[in-house]
């Protein structure tokens, strides 16, 4: 009779333990009902990128000295740099610079080691196309700023607000106070 009682007690303990686990899981599930959704509706809402986000590379043709440091530090030797040596000025002249973003791993080494800071990472991450050859950007395509930066409402608002402050200061300084 004694083993039968211990069997019922262990069965009862297992039942209570299972009910406790189910109750804890149910509480966790119900706690998520008050939270806002984490996902966003992508085409209509854009996610805000972090400060250190590594997106498409921006290239400034005038700053580049054709030193090819970016090619040497790239793990896949990706940037293609074409240049010629100008004997009259004794310097390299950059002819063409291109990066294939279909192959690029966005490691950021080229940006980090560039001595003239002619390369920078943008926040642009929408690089999808139907043709992989469209991902090969030359110096003209690389020099374009992303649309998000050019058409950003906050940047325009900041520009306008600083301009209006300057105009207010000019008008305030130009006033003369006369006592009657």
UniProtKB/Swiss-Prot annotation:
SUPFAM superfamilies cross-referenced by the UniProt entry: 4Fe-4S ferredoxins
Subcellular compartments: Plastid, Chloroplast thylakoid membrane
Gene Ontology MF, one: quinone binding
Membrane topology: Peripheral membrane protein
Keyword Hydrolase (UniProt): no
Amino acids binding [4Fe-4S] cluster 1: 64, 67, 70, 114
Entry EC number(s): 7.1.1.-
Binding site for [4Fe-4S] cluster 2: 74, 104, 107, 110
NCBIfam families to which the protein is assigned, alphabetical: ndhI (TIGR00403), NuoI (TIGR01971), PRK05888.1-3 (NF004537)
Record text on subunit structure and interactions: NDH is composed of at least 16 different subunits, 5 of which are encoded in the nucleus.
HAMAP family: NDH1_NuoI (MF_01351)
UniProt protein name: NAD(P)H-quinone oxidoreductase subunit I, chloroplastic
